[in-house]
Amino acid sequence: MIPDVSSDTLFWLKANPQALQGIYRGVERETLRINTQGHLAQTPHPKKLGAALTHKWITTDFAETLLEFITPVAQDIDHMLTLLRDIHRHVARHLCNEWMWPMSMPCFIDSQQQIKLAQYGPSNMGRMKTLYRKGLKNRYSAMMQIISGVHYNFSLPLTFWQVYAGVSDMNSNKDIISAGYLGLIRNYYRFGWIIPYIFGASPGVCQSFMKNRDTDLPFIKASSGFLYLPYATSLRMSDLGYANKSQSQLDITFNSLKEYVFRLKHAIRTPYADYQRIGLKKNGSYLQLNTNILQSENELYAPIRPKRITKNEESPLDALLRRGIEYIEVRALDINPFSPVGIDEEQVRFLDLFLIWCTLAPAPKMSTRELLYTRLNWTKVILEGRKPGLTLIVDGGSSKKPLATIGKELFSAMQALAETLDSHNGNIQYQQVCHKLRACIDQPELTLSARILKEMKKYGIRGLGLTLANQYFQILLEEPLEMFNELTFDKEQIRSWHRQLELEALDILSFDDFLAHINSHQQ
């Protein structure tokens, strides 16, 4: 059932310790700004944090109040997490009577009218980013778009591909490297449900989130008023969060990069009836970028994405096709409410271990049928992952097996890899993480979702969220910066505003012509 990393591969890894030296990592963390009463902040993005359009490390996602922090790429885990913490510390110093909401599912919201679209200035690029968000609002509702998460970016070093696959350089051997990452992604789809099982932290939602929404989910109402599913792990990953029916027809199986790009480009240029009914414009004002299945590739909701840094006006899909996959973006992480920065070292080490295992383990091609079954498994884990005796579909749909059995097999498979990784580093950190998290299989009460649900029942979502938000705010406020300094942040703030002004001055096309140009480049 569980594909094993062969003893030959482990022997090779032990004999080539340099292969995994220099893994590139990065974190993107989203968080809502709230006032001290627990309501969504109604203030614009603080000017002292720089221009959201052009700042390297501090921007906004869907809403003006939805902050997004982006770490520089780092090779050391502690270094990366310290950079992330420094960004949080800096932001805490520049919030006025506001805190950062510490959970994935939103705080109390009286009305969707309180959710203001992120603003990026009058440049064509800035207006397009806001219009894209307006399209998301019109397609899926604003409430769904202010769910927060953590994205983990992961890239294996060139030395790995050189030794593992005989690659000489990134450019001439891009197809080999891309094939390796696609194998990782296929195994991630097959077994990545382990991430929401262990780290999912959104088993409940504020009642305001469900206002005017129909659902068949059998919610239980807690005494404090919030709604929850007793065995849920990540409602953020469910149909309540990032899901839509228009994308269910996209038959993306990650068997080849060309196929992946072709199917996404097809979605970007194929009209969709529901979105055509919304319309492109109303009273001369744009309602969305276009009326197609996807406005752009960013609209694809997936638990993992292949990525490549773009050049100039290049689209992300063209960049992938021309130069291959550069890194992968893990998108299945809820905000860790027990961490001031939404993620901790234990999670990063587990992700490293799991992603390396996904790369080294056999990853046969995936049929459309198997992809459907993997999605069903994810859904079961997301909605009832801690349910005793829960079974998952295995062997391409031919049989079922208890989650607990598969989970133990998975950890056994990763244990040997953890030992090999630790032998390179002269410690037992990966083995410790493997041993500790393995206990979550037999003891689901140790998972993040079980732990946070227990606290939610005790204090309510609002009470717990405010307590943690205030606690983390005070901690971050009192801690000194370690990697960055205030001068660095000041310089980046000034640079970001100058760059935004440059973009505004460089515009030569009307917004209509600019949009037509962008849409034609996505064909």
Swiss-Prot record:
Gene Ontology terms: cellular component: cytosol
E.C. no: 6.3.2.2
Covalent S-S links between cysteines: none
Catalytic activity: L-cysteine + L-glutamate + ATP = gamma-L-glutamyl-L-cysteine + ADP + phosphate + H(+)
Keywords of this entry: ATP-binding, Glutathione biosynthesis, Ligase, Nucleotide-binding
Class of this enzyme: ligase
InterPro entries reported in the protein's UniProt record: Gln_synth/guanido_kin_cat_dom, Glu_cys_ligase, Glut_cys_ligase
Pathway: Sulfur metabolism; glutathione biosynthesis; glutathione from L-cysteine and L-glutamate: step 1/2
One BP annotation, GO: glutathione biosynthetic process
UniProt key word Nucleotide-binding: yes
Family recorded in the similarity comment: Belongs to the glutamate--cysteine ligase type 1 family. Type 1 subfamily.
Entry-linked PANTHER family: GLUTAMATE--CYSTEINE LIGASE (PTHR38761:SF1)
HAMAP family linked: Glu_cys_ligase
Entry protein name: Glutamate--cysteine ligase
Gene name in the database record: gshA
